[in-house]
Amino acid sequence: KQDVIDKFKETTVKGSQFKQPLLEFSGACAGCGEPPYAKLITQLFGDRMYIANATGCTSIWGNSSPSTPYTANKAGKGPAWSNSLFEDNAEFGYGMLLAQRAIRDGLKAKVEDVVANGTNEDVKAAGQEWLDTFAVGATNGAATDKLVAALEACGCDKAKEILAQKDFLAKKSQWIFGGDGWAYDIGFGGVDHVLASGKDINVMVFDTEVYSNTGGQSSKSTKTGAIAQFAAGGKETKKKD
């Protein structure tokens, strides 16, 4: 297995497909092109992924009670998913990012204190590695595992204080999912606001060029001349750039 991983890096198209998908058996419409994109993203970032999902097809095949296609790996890590209103999903996802960043900043201060003033060398070494990779998602996960193990072995009061929020120690990959009806039309102002922030956040637009979940009505993403509901004679305006 390790030989394959070394030969085909996960940062390549082929190499990414040797990673476990953390989205499976979605129940989407036959031939739907949306789940494969989400599956690929979970292969790359799923074990540390937060998803803010705009109401639409992605919330129907993505988390219709009582089941969900999002799953966890053998370590129990997988995407954390939540659904928002159609009109404010970008802001909702941005809020998720700011909230977990605030918690991590608090944890960072505590780890810095342990590294500077602690007496347990294992905790200090693991803490320094965690601090060095604080903003690097690809390597911070492994550093977090080492830090958690060292803190659990230590058992001191400061360690227990940090471990109380251990789920927030690892650097997260924040994603915002939604369709073109959300991103081009109803939630466009929020998308613009979030992208303009320059923060470390990702937006995935499932652009079907119509309002898919409500039956195929035209959106600002629909191309000129396309026939859709509310555009039976062909859409008169061009696709929003």
Give short role names for the model-derived ranges.
Residues W61-G62, E161-D241:
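Thiamine diphosphate
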Residues F86-E161:
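N-terminal leader/propeptide and maturation segments of large enzyme subunits in energy/redox metabolism
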Residues Q17, L23-T55, S59-P66:
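N-terminal amphipathic, basic-rich helices that act as targeting or association modules
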Residues G33-L44, K160-E161, D185-V191:
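Short alpha-helical segments and helix-capping/turn motifs at coil-helix boundaries
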Residues K1-Q2, T58-N89:
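Terminal amphipathic helices with adjacent charged low-complexity linkers/tails
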Residues K1-V13:
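Non-heme iron-sulfur electron-transfer modules
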Residues P35, L40, L44, R48, ...:
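Generic, well-ordered alpha-helical scaffold segments in large soluble proteins
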Residues G15-Q20, E24-A28, S84-L98, I103-T119, ...:
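Conserved thiamine diphosphate
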